[in-house]
Amino acid sequence: MKVFEFLKGKRGAMGIGTLIIFIAMVLVAAVAAAVLINTSGFLQQKAMATGKESTEQVASGLSTLQVIGIHDNKAINYLAIYITPNAGSAAIDLNQTKILITDGEKKAVLRYNSNAYADLTTGGEVTNTSLAAWNLSGGEFGIIVLQDADGSCKSTTPVINKGDIVALTINASAVGLNLVPRTTVTGSVIPEFGAPAVIEFTTPAAYLSTQEVIQLQ
């Protein structure tokens, strides 16, 4: 009888032990599942953020619409580079944008001067060199706003986005560029991220006194 009771108690103890082990396994599995779910969610968000950044990096950038020059019959003294954001581009801060330009001898890196700004969205003459946007020294470029539906491109916060068009102004003489006839000019407008706008043209064989403003690109 005592042996039977002993065996019965032993089986009961084994049953309780098995139950404890089972509960412990369930708890461990639950914790592991929670960790996996959290990790999976984090990685998914990280992947989505990285994908968005990559898409913006690929789609974003600037395009050159045209380049015009203003000459004095001997050399081009002023340049205006018309740019717009690429289709699908994120907003671009021109404060963080640089212009690299060379005439084959002089190489210059230009940064935006917030005092050299003009808004011609309601009309005006880009080539009017009395505009503040043309008041530049070496190492600087200015901005003339031509199209800006949401008013995002201000003198101190020059941000351009979809549909905006601006002319970046350069005082070629102040920079030290010698833009006499038959000069090959190359360069780029480099935003903080995305594709740069390309500058590439050769000045005409001669400058006509009857045509002070010429299209170069």
Swiss-Prot record:
<dbReference type="GO" id="GO:0005198">
    <property type="term" value="F:structural molecule activity"/>
</dbReference>
<feature type="propeptide">
    <location>
        <begin position="1"/>
        <end position="12"/>
    </location>
</feature>
<comment type="similarity">
    <text>Belongs to the archaeal flagellin family.</text>
</comment>
<dbReference type="InterPro" id="IPR002774">
    <property type="entry name" value="Flagellin_arc"/>
</dbReference>
<dbReference type="GO" id="GO:0097589">
    <property type="term" value="C:archaeal-type flagellum"/>
</dbReference>
<comment type="function">
    <text>Flagellin is the subunit protein which polymerizes to form the filaments of archaeal flagella.</text>
</comment>
<dbReference type="InterPro" id="IPR013373">
    <property type="entry name" value="Flagellin/pilin_N_arc"/>
</dbReference>
<keyword id="KW-0974">Archaeal flagellum</keyword>
<protein>
    <recommendedName>
        <fullName>Flagellin B2</fullName>
    </recommendedName>
</protein>
<dbReference type="Pfam" id="PF01917">
    <property type="entry name" value="Arch_flagellin"/>
</dbReference>
<dbReference type="GO" id="GO:0097588">
    <property type="term" value="P:archaeal or bacterial-type flagellum-dependent cell motility"/>
</dbReference>
